[in-house]
Amino acid sequence: MKTIEITVPGSKSLTNRAIILASLSNGTSKISNISNSQDSQIMIKAMKKIGVQIKKTGNKLLIKGNGGVFRKIDGNIDVGDAGTVARFLTAIISLIPGKITLIKSKRMKERPMKELIKALKTIRTGIILIRGDISSQFISSIMMIAPILDKGLVINITGRRISNSYIDMTIDLMKKFGVKVEKNKQNKFIIKKQSIIPTNYVVESDLSGASYFFAAGAISGKTIKVKNINFRSKQGDLIFPDLLKKMGCHIKKNIKKGWIKVKGPKILKRINVNMSEMPDTAQTLAIVAAFAKGKTTIAGLSTLKMKETDRLKALKNELNKMKIKCEITDDSIKIEGGTPQKATIETYGDHRMAMAFTVAKLRIPGLKIKNPEVVKKSFPSFWKKFNYICE
């Protein structure tokens, strides 16, 4: 059987971070292989509105940074339901003279922001205290503005830290923009006042997006190769194929050429796993688990309740429709694998619900996905890519 080769677009998470850092730098940066996701388009529009010069050509951006010096601005900025934009922009506008109001979707208004706002109120003192168990985006947003603060910043994180991989991703990208981040103990970061150096940066492939094609290989009998993988990536989702290997999949990696190949076994095995470092691929693994033999437990999912929808409840509802038994707690889901049946899947306005359940169509041709257009939030070309592997 032939190998189906796929590439995925640039990471939305890294694109949005690169836009912020380039905007705060002291010169012109070129960002290539950007995500053309809806969220990244919202980020570009928002940064332009606060005075940053950005020129977009295809999947490239030319950004003229202002060194963190903004003119007075009054007005509204629509961030829709883009979580990274809302959190990252809140940190930046706390430094801008004037009154700026972020217009958010109904769901975005329900997602946590208070802890970030509380921390930003003391940011000019040079020392802040922030909880680490709500959203890693709070910490990333504060880290990225720290170099332009007069006193720099000491960030003290209380409680356990969730989604550490996203914080590591932020630190790694800051280094690429010439920023030094000191780590003092597990929950303390020191970022001195310093210049953010403009750079030419190529955005890595989106490994959350790649997970759907890895999962497709796991359940379909097809051999699928995802190309342009950066094996030095800080994206937590890099280890997703390793989880599939534990479930019995055949995995091949070529670090030099940058690809990962996945082919599923005749019978998938259950798995017990903590996915706190890669929560965006939990729904993908849940679909694979639905076809596995035995009960799979996926833990470390406390943040899923606060995403585009309550993803744990949404998973339970839709898996039940497919005649798959599952149980949920505040931070986990247990799935009894079996023979999923065709159903009409509600996506709850959540791009990851749509893409994860679409994978099941490879085994259940009659499965229907409601509001399939929601994928544009992170992966506008998803359907084109998926239809290619169905040929």
Question: Model segments located where?
Answer:
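Structural preference for solvent-exposed beta-strand-turn elements
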Residues: 1-391
